[in-house]
Amino acid sequence: MAATLRIQSDWSQALRRDEGEAWLSCRSPGKPTLYGSLTRRGLSTEGVPDIAASEGFVVGEVTKKSILISCPHENVSTKFLAPYTTFSRIHQKSITCLDISSGGGLGVSTSTDGTMKIWQAANGEIRRLLEGHVYDVNCCRFFPSGLVVLSGGMDAQLKIWSAEDASCVVTFKGHKGGILDTAIVDRGRNVLSCSRDGTARLWDCGKSSCLAVIADCGSPINGIAVGTADDSVNLGTPEKAPSEREIGTEGKILLLAREDKKLQGVGLQSRQPVFLFDGSDAFNCCTFLSSTYFLAGTQDGNIYQLDVRNTNAPIQIIHRSGAPVLSLLPYRDGFIASQGDGTCFIVQQDLDYVIDLTEADCDPVYKVAPWEKQIYTCCRDGVVRRYQLGDL
């Protein structure tokens, strides 16, 4: 695995001061870590800090919110990005999940303070409080319309809410344990959930009923993802004709990130197993990059890239630290990942550097939600951070 560059979490504040300093490190497996520092020498005429790096590190482009650092000896470069803005008043405690609406106007988040809130994405102003789950809410997401929210709680209930008036319009009951993740099929006539009870279920929103148990694997399912599978993949055939209430399940595959170190693929309409992949540790999350490629992240810091047509061996394993991989999602021609040590990074195929979203100081970044060139993250420190990406 390639070398990893790290920077002091509050580097942008530290380098605002005259002669301010921030530490750097370059860690390469099997070699001693190279430590260094950045020092501010002054300001350029455009008001951008003039930054010098210690031996072994090179400073590239600097803006008010970003700095490109390379370590030529290890042939590695990282662009560190500071938040454009932070919202610390949405919740009082750790924020466990968030999502941004399709139009970019609203955010929804859940917290260990026991609340789920809808807020304005531009300024963090709270618009609605979604009340009705017993115990903590684990996951929340907007439907594609951006007007409706799906949530899952430790109370084993799945709920659908109106973002406009905060009313709970549907409650799904059937799981025997806390709900850990959800997914939406197409436009949202059907939704999916997975639970500590070891099952993944398909639900009919219109009739608020369970259409099927898609998988029952005897191990908690930590994360799910649904995607259209490549035509060459045999998804199996249903044992009985699908209900007419089932909409958009054909040709889809459901990924299950399991606690028992297994990643499973199931034909969504057929309910038939497609593959079973053994990982190094519990799988926490998974996502599709395309109809052929998908990613899955483990508790010991591995990100597996797999090809749905042949899951015998991974295409690659990305490992930047031993911290749990908590969130994965596709972004442009690459992906965004967040980990339990506060790191959050973006990998793009055509970029020769990694983009590192900084400021969380060793607190897990639980979830990431992109909207166009803005990336929102939520963290154990109770802060929602919004990053502004330049032209990639």
From Swiss-Prot:
An example Gene Ontology CC term for this record: proteasome complex
SUPFAM superfamilies, per database record: WD40 repeat-like (SSF50978)
WD repeat boundaries on the chain: 90-129, 132-171, 174-213, 278-316, 359-392
Record key words, sorted: Proteasome, Repeat, WD repeat
Alphabetical list of Gene3D superfamilies matching this protein: YVTN repeat-like/Quinoprotein amine dehydrogenase (2.130.10.10)
A Pfam family assignment: WD40
Domain of life per record: Eukaryota
InterPro entries named among the record's database cross-references: WD40/YVTN_repeat-like_dom_sf (IPR015943), WD40_repeat_dom_sf (IPR036322), WD40_rpt (IPR001680), WD_repeat_multifunction (IPR051179)
UniProt subunit comment: Interacts with proteasome 26S subunit ATPases.
Recorded family membership: Belongs to the WD repeat PAAF1/RPN14 family.
Role description: Inhibits proteasome 26S assembly and activity by impairing the association of the 19S regulatory complex with the 20S core.
Protein name according to UniProt: Proteasomal ATPase-associated factor 1
Source organism (scientific name): Gallus gallus
